Amino acid sequence: MREEEKKTSQVKKLQQFFRKRWVFPAIYLVSAAVILTAVLWYQSVSNDEVKDQLADNGGNSAYDNNDDAVEVGKSMENVAMPVVDSENVSVVKKFYETDAAKEEKEAALVTYNNTYSLSKGIDLAEKDGKDFDVSASLSGTVVKAEKDPVLGYVVEVEHADGLSTVYQSLSEVSVEQGDKVKQNQVIGKSGKNLYSEDSGNHVHFEIRKDGVAMNPLNFMDKPVSSIEKAATQETEESIQQSSEKKDGSTEKGTEEKSGEKKDDSTDKSGSKESSTTEDTEQS
């Protein structure tokens, strides 16, 4: 009986305890404090692990990895005329296009040492024949800056993805091999050369993609990506033309062989008829 009375008394005390207004709020606060402490502890441990990993990687995060970084500014450049003052400069010799009119083809020929050559770029000159500042058409690295006895001073600037620009017939240069140049930066002055004397005081400008000359006038004020697209298109067209020529040659050869077989069978048939006729006459 006493044990039952003790249990009953304990239950009543608990009931009285929980009936107090501050009990449940206190329980909630304690629970929240425990949960918050656990969360903060977990975050602290996670941050320590991340710091350890960064320390192992030399302190570099994924955003610090510049190996795959894209030079957005350069890729967004448009091809510019290689002159500081383009208003007073005009094209005096164009790029030789195989599908151009006869007159345009003749005008795009270069005569040197009694030999005709195809113009692989454009010649730019001022109307009054004076020299002018030549600037970089695109940003890049100077891979060549030297004097040629026939072409004058030559500067070649290398860009990304097999693209390069060439500047010839310069009277002087203001850059050296290995220099980094920005678009529209002055790299030299126009001049005269022996290779294209009829162009007078000029600069010869070329755009090359993987060593192949492209018509600069097709890309002026257009993004660099347009050169890549044009080069890809030309390659595809060249492959298609080669394939068509190959198919045409195969068909022609097949027709010739078929004709030979037909002629041979005709000859054999004629021989048989002739033999039959002779046998009949002898009879």
Curated annotation (Swiss-Prot):
CDD domains: M23_peptidase. One of its GO terms (cellular component) is endospore-forming forespore. GO terms for biological process: sporulation resulting in formation of a cellular spore. It comes from the Bacteria. The chain crosses the membrane at residues 22-42. Involved in forespore engulfment and required for anchoring membrane proteins on the forespore side of the septal membrane. Forms a channel with SpoIIIAH that is open on the forespore end and closed (or gated) on the mother cell end. This allows sigma-E-directed gene expression in the mother-cell compartment of the sporangium to trigger the activation of sigma-G forespore-specific gene expression by a pathway of intercellular signaling. This is Stage II sporulation protein Q. The gene is spoIIQ.
